[in-house]
Structure formats: C-alpha cells, structure tokens
Design a protein with these regions (language model features):
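Conserved, mostly hydrophobic/aromatic
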Residues: 8, 39, 47, 92, ...
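Glycine/small-residue-rich loop that forms an oxyanion/phosphate-binding "nest" at active or ligand-binding sites
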Residues: 53, 61-118
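Charged helix-capping and loop-helix junction motifs
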Residues: 60-67, 141-150, 175-184
C-alpha cells in the first residue's frame, strides 16, 4: 500500500480543514516545499496536494507553490482542487505533476470526465467525497442525489482505474476512518485502485486498510499533529 502525505494549500500556506469547513482551518506552515522535504526525509515517495482555493473558487492562486513542488523532484505528485478543464490538466502535467484529480467536474460533467479518462488514462484519478453516503461537490458545499458507491461503479464503467474516496464526516476529525466503507468499495467495485482518505489516525487502521487491499492511503492531520509518525508508517505498510 502506498502512503500519500497531504499538503493542502490555501493562499500558498500549508493548512488543514476540519470536515471540509473553510472556517475551521489550521495553518501548519508557510513553505510547502519545506514541508514536502520533511516528508521525503521520512521516506515518502508520494505526495497528495490539494489546491483549496481552486476547489472553492476555481482560481490558480496556488499555481506557483504547485510548480515549485513539482520541480522539487523525488516524489510522485498528484494534484486536485479546481481542475475542471483540459487546459488545467495540461498545465499541471506540463509542470511535472504525475496525476491530476478530477473532483466536482466528475459529477457535473461526466462526459468530460469520461473523455479525459480515455485520453490520459492513469494520469487521471477521480476524487469522490461523500457526506452521509452521498457525493458532495464544490469544496463539499453541495451534496448531490447520487450515492458514492453507485458513482464509483459508473466511474469504473467509464474506465477509471483510480479513485480517492473521502468520507467527509471522518476527515480531519482524528477519530479514525470508515473501514467498513473501504471494505465495501473493495468488494463492490473491483478493478479500481482505491485510496483511503479522511480520519486515518492509527497504525492499526493502516494495517487493516492494507489487509483489505486498499491501494493507497492519504495521511493529513494525523501527521501534522504528531498522532502518526510518517517514517514508521512508511516502514510498516508501504510497498
């Protein structure tokens, strides 16, 4: 199982939100590259980057920070947040970003998403964020009428091979993750590499996720608060 430490960007700063709430934001650093280097020194080979300004407003205000992270080297980098056009995908891939994550647009424009999956293959992942089991969009501000598991099936049928699934209720809450959900996804949507995201706060959870065949896990607040030690986690579960 691969581990993706997370860097969430707001106004160029490293931050974490609680349950996707922009009013419940904690700033953990002013320098994303310095934070990424700390992750590398702990043994990380992957990095999950979210442009929170992009997710909320569609802006490119964190573009320089993302460019600097991509230029740093030594990490497989996936980026999400506000990617709603092919132009934005090309922009990030040309920087050296390894994979772009489509979020809200996968719900609002499924045909576009299917085309991008066909055109770019494994360089596209889809982020599915669910609130009470239903897909949430636009920075988690709106909830759709479609169940997350059903949406994952549709994505798989469209050729999606990688889905980052977040249960919003668990995200940033430091109360554990929804293991039953990831077990269900592995069983009901075979053939998709799922990344678990939201609330992972113990080594036991990581081991359980690996055991059930989860492809990757994103670690956020648990690293910033010191609840988990990245070096030990990498040694424990990373391929």
């Amino acid at each position: 199982m691969n581990l993706f430490p997370a860097i969430d960007l707001r106004d160029g700063k490293v931050v974490r939100l609680t349950q996707g709430d922009y009013d419940r934001m904690t700033v953990y650093g002013e320098d994303p590259c310095a934070q990424a280097w700390q992750f590398v020194e702990a043994g990380a080979r992957y990095l999950h980057v979210v442009d929170l300004d992009g997710a909320k407003d569609g802006t490119l205000s964190n573009y320089r920070s993302i460019a600097a992270l991509a230029k740093q080297g030594g990490l497989y980098i996936e980026v999400g947040g506000g990617i709603r056009t092919e132009e934005r995908i090309e922009k990030y891939l040309s920087l050296g970003v390894d994979r772009c994550i489509l979020g809200s647009v996968a719900v609002t424009d499924f045909d576009f998403t299917a085309r991008m999956l066909k055109r770019y293959g494994e360089r596209i992942a889809v982020g599915v964020d669910a609130k009470d089991g239903f897909v949430a969009i636009h920075g988690w501000k709106e909830v759709s009428a479609e169940k997350g598991v059903d949406f994952c099936r549709r994505l798989a049928d469209a050729g999606c091979t990688a889905i980052i699934y977040t249960d919003i209720a668990y995200d940033g809450a430091m109360q554990g993750t929804n293991l039953a959900l990831y077990r269900q996804l592995a069983t009901e949507v075979p053939g998709v590499a799922f990344t678990a995201s939201g609330g992972i706060s113990s080594e036991a959870e990581l081991l359980e996720l690996k055991k059930m065949g989860t492809a990757a896990a994103i670690l956020g607040k648990s690293l910033y608060t010191g609840a988990l030690d990245l070096k030990r986690c990498v040694e424990l579960v990373q391929n």
